[in-house]
């Protein structure tokens, strides 16, 4: 019964958070298959590697620190944030190679997915190991669902945002951005673990996490608003060149695009996806070089032709 309840308490909230983050990214929503892959890395891969490396690092530290309480505090406050942020963030270095990973919003979504997966598995383990009474179990479920697991989401999403920012930058800026992102993610993790390790700082820890979550939500919102502006700006030239109607500009970057009547319903979804992708490909082209530049140029030509044919076929009906 405990294991079943713990599984539900661990999986349902985290997967719900994942769906919310994925849904909020409404202008260029990431393929859910890829988001889920990152989530599962956090839930399985990152957990396994974190456990292995934490054991190795802790064994090394125990050579110098013999006192059990001090060693446990050090493992919680320093070793866990360092090792876990590396194992969670490492997968993003593979995800960023995807052409789907192209802006800060994407970094937040993919990084957040990994953090939520990690938090889900960690929650389950905590629920079954430390929920020895009903009151303890409920308390742990509430705290970890609202704070600890969300901390993993925010920390790795932060690293993902820095990673996305660095993607089209020159080498020096790229390296410094990635390193800074890792340090910020580790600081968030370390600050939370430190605060809940001592009774006198627990309240401060909750306040810190509330503040951090608010900043995370604001950053996510600003990134979404930025995408809205990119869509309008990049499609303005397409309207001037006659590819799309001017009247569509203010529709394509708003919720009105999900309503009926402004374009032939048989092509609405395909049209929205195509013009939105075109807008972001144009922005990516400006920041790219080498093989990536050639890829985006080809993609832009493809989507322009696709949109032209789509609208022409509708007019000829």
Task: Go through the PLM ranges and name each one.
Residues 1-317:
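Hydrophobic alpha-helical segments at protein termini of multi-pass membrane proteins
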């Amino acid at each position: 019964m405990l294991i079943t309840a713990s599984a539900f308490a661990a999986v349902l909230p985290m997967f719900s958070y994942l769906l919310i983050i994925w849904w909020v990214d409404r202008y260029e929503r990431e393929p859910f298959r890829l988001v889920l892959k990152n989530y599962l890395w956090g839930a399985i891969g990152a957990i396994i590697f974190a456990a292995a490396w934490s054991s190795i690092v802790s064994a090394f530290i125990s050579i110098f620190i013999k006192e059990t309480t001090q060693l446990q505090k050090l493992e919680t406050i320093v070793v866990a944030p360092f090792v876990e942020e590396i194992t969670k963030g490492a997968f993003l270095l593979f995800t960023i190679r995807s052409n789907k990973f192209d802006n800060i919003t994407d970094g937040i979504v993919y990084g957040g997915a990994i953090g939520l997966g990690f938090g889900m598995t960690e929650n389950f383990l905590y629920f079954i190991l430390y929920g020895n009474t009903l009151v303890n179990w409920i308390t742990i479920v509430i705290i970890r669902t609202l704070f600890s697991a969300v901390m993993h989401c925010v920390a790795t999403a932060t690293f993902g945002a820095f990673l996305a920012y660095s993607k089209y930058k020159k080498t020096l800026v790229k390296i410094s951005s990635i390193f800074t992102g890792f340090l910020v993610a580790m600081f968030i993790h370390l600050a939370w673990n430190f605060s809940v390790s001592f009774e006198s700082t627990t309240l401060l820890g909750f306040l810190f996490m509330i503040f951090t979550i608010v900043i995370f939500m604001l950053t996510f919102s600003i990134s979404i608003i930025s995408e809205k502006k990119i869509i309008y700006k990049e499609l303005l030239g397409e309207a001037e060149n006659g590819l799309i109607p001017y009247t569509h500009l203010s529709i394509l970057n708003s919720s009105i695009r999900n309503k009926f009547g402004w374009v032939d319903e048989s092509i609405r979804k395909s049209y929205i996806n195509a013009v939105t992708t075109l807008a972001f490909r144009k922005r990516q082209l400006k920041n790219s070089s080498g093989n990536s530049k050639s890829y985006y140029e080809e993609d832009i030509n493809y989507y322009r032709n696709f949109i032209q044919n789509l609208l022409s076929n509708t007019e000829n009906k």
